[in-house]
Amino acid sequence: MLKKYFNDPVAFALVLEHSRMVADKALAIAASANARVDFTFIEEAALLHDIGVARIYSPRLGCFGNAPYICHGVLGREILEGEGLPDHAMVCERHIGVGLTADDIIRQKLPLPAREMIPLTLEEKIICFADLFYSKKPGNIPAEKSLNEIRSGLEKFGAHKVVVLDRWLTEWGMS
């Protein structure tokens, strides 16, 4: 389904490679977390979590849509709801950073609907967490970020974002 929405083969290849790495990481986290999760859903949703990138404007990614990058989660939700995948759609919307609160959106003046976009289910949280490890930057996709790099990136948006990360690490026995 991912290919259906990408006109540029370079953009498709970048997003597919990134999404495959996120899916593999999410499946490994789910397996080690000893929790009851839907592994099939995790793989499917992780592979589709960045489908909204097809509609953003980012020439370095080979995308020439109209929306800014931050909108790719909401756009992905729209796409997947249209495809009849409402649960997968919520992963798209809720995977940005460790999630966006309505307050984050308002305070940062983001071009997004002012609503809660934080991962709620364990599967959503695992995919969101796994996504933090990988960039979509061409030439840098396979490089896995360290937890210190992830923490530094999240700190730019407030200490409360690092608290969420640390809570997940503790919950999953990874701290």
Please provide the spans of the model-predicted regions.
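Charged phosphate-binding loop/patch that engages nucleotide di/tri-phosphates or the phosphate backbone
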Residues: 152-175
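Amphipathic alpha-helical segments within well-ordered protein domains
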Residues: 2-3, 23, 27, 76-81, ...
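Divalent metal-dependent catalytic cores for phosphoryl transfer on phosphate-bearing substrates
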Residues: 7, 35-147
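A short, charge-rich alpha-helical start-of-domain segment used by transcription regulators
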Residues: 13-17
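Generic N-terminal amphipathic, Lys/Arg-enriched alpha-helix
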Residues: 1-12
